[in-house]
Amino acid sequence: MAKSRPLQRSTALRSHAFPASQHPAPALGMSSDKALLPLGALMLAASMGAAAQGSAPETTMSTVTVKETAEIQGKDTLLLKKTTVGKGKQDIKDIPQSVTVFTEKLMADRNQDDFREVLRTTAGVTFLAGETGEEDVRLRGFSLGQAGDIYIDGMKDAPLIERDTFNHDRVEVLKGSASMLFGKGSTGGVVNQVNKAPLLIDQHEAAYTFGTGNSHRATGDFNFVTGENAAFRLNAMVQEADNYGAKQDKRGIAPTFAWGIGTRDEFSIGLYYLESKGRPTYNHPWRLSADGKINTTLPARNFYGLESDYTNTSSQYATLGHIHRFDDGGELNTRLRYGTYERDMLASTIGFQNSAITLGQINDSTVLTRYGSKGRMGESDVLQVQSDYSNTFNWGGKKHAVLTGVDYYDDDAKRNQNYANTT
């Protein structure tokens, strides 16, 4: 037993305790078997324990099912159940007012390329000719432009500009008092244009449309996935038309990049540019009939103006967005937008050379003349900051929704007085 202690130590520290010449000694060989017995017993016990564990029955966890409604694109459906016409995403059924949503698919099926064409099919919407040629959109009799009730992604849009649907995912119309959801505005309603956003799927689409009046229009919608939660989307449009002298040429492009899509913090940056050059139809010569009613005997399809008439508009803005999602389901949506909007118009006022001419005297030889012109120039530099917080919670056995936020809007407008001349 006196020898077993140093021999056990030499097994663990063999390379340090003995020279190499002493390893073949018989005493070392005889004692090594005894020294390894405890190690062999330990290995046998470990193998028996492993076998016992392997024979234990497996425990199967119960199946967990997770359900969530997929985000639906405007181009995939004619009907949407949610809207962002307010300061957050809501179910249409929860808004105690009439809401109409025009999805991208619906606008494409109807071939509605212009903002006015979309609204023209909405009950309660009418159009009046403005003093400087633009159309005044009215909802339930109230002017949307004058009240500032036209929005883009929930942020106020500039008035007196040309609009197009090439970058629209949908157009939402809320009828009724706008103050319920926006805290301002008229009692007519609100129109909200929702721009297309990057998606986590590669998809590309191009379209070409042609028609009478030398009308040609080409659009492109391209979406690229650039990372695990990042994507880039580009929309572009070119349109040309010359309908009996009333020309219109439009160019538009809208790139958007987003990262962190669907995560706790989502960021986006987008640019938008739309340029429109046209020749307006400012007025139509007319005469009063014997009973005092306005009578337009000249064909409406003709262009009553001069080749030098023009209406040029441009819209360009950049938008930065950030969405923070809290653990309790709350969401803080912050947007910063800066844009420049320009409008330059010169239109002729056309009438009969003989101001005393009667309806019975009008024929193919009747001479028309230009009585004067109407013009307007304007430029607006707009800065907007908007931050909205929304959340839902249960209290008192009922579900409640919280919606609050801040909104800053600064419009530095430079406009001349409406000018007119008779030369």
What are these regions (language model features)?
Residues 99, 131, 211-214, 247-249, ...:
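Short sequence motifs at beta-strands and strand-loop junctions characteristic
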